């Protein structure tokens, strides 16, 4: 993401949560608008049980005499990612708030973004940054175990999207094949047109 674009759509699948958040925070401070899709497929290093215990300890942090005053603990993967990015921004200043407004994080790949080019961040990919054999877990599983109710719905919508996407890709390949064969036949057609065919 060296050059500035209007909007960058990042596919979060297979990325490490903290590493991706740091890259996104840096881009936001530079004025770049960033959309992060498939937040439920983000990875966290360390085995699942350890991460769940850490998250449950975080959930216990509250105001003793009136918990509705805060702190607020979001369970959705997109909100967990936004909170991670917020911690890397000066969010109490006008500059930090403006940067945070340029971030959009969603579960799955909803309609505006399923037709757009998605990118990955090599510096944050688990297969490149985590040692082979190390334990890791997904944010989606963690969220669903601490109170996020929409894991099944997002999975169902993703299956539908993948079927549509595969059909579109096959149609695109067929169209490219036709264009290629037409280009190959063009010299022959020119020769035939000289003789009135």
Swiss-Prot record:
Localization: Cytoplasm
A cellular component annotation (GO) from this entry: ribosome
GO BP, sorted A to Z: cytoplasmic translation; negative regulation of translation
Gene Ontology terms, MF aspect: mRNA binding; structural constituent of ribosome
Domain of life per record: Eukaryota
Keyword annotations from UniProtKB, A to Z: Cytoplasm, Phosphoprotein, Ribonucleoprotein, Ribosomal protein
Phosphoserine, modified sites: 193
UniProt function note: Component of the ribosome, a large ribonucleoprotein complex responsible for the synthesis of proteins in the cell. The small ribosomal subunit (SSU) binds messenger RNAs (mRNAs) and translates the encoded message by selecting cognate aminoacyl-transfer RNA (tRNA) molecules. The large subunit (LSU) contains the ribosomal catalytic site termed the peptidyl transferase center (PTC), which catalyzes the formation of peptide bonds, thereby polymerizing the amino acids delivered by tRNAs into a polypeptide chain.
Subunit composition and interactions: Component of the large ribosomal subunit (LSU). Mature yeast ribosomes consist of a small (40S) and a large (60S) subunit. The 40S small subunit contains 1 molecule of ribosomal RNA (18S rRNA) and at least 33 different proteins. The large 60S subunit contains 3 rRNA molecules (25S, 5.8S and 5S rRNA) and at least 46 different proteins.
Anything else known: There are 3 genes for uL13 in S.pombe.
HAMAP family per the UniProt record, alphabetical: Ribosomal_uL13
Family: Belongs to the universal ribosomal protein uL13 family.
Name the UniProt record assigns to this protein: Large ribosomal subunit protein uL13B
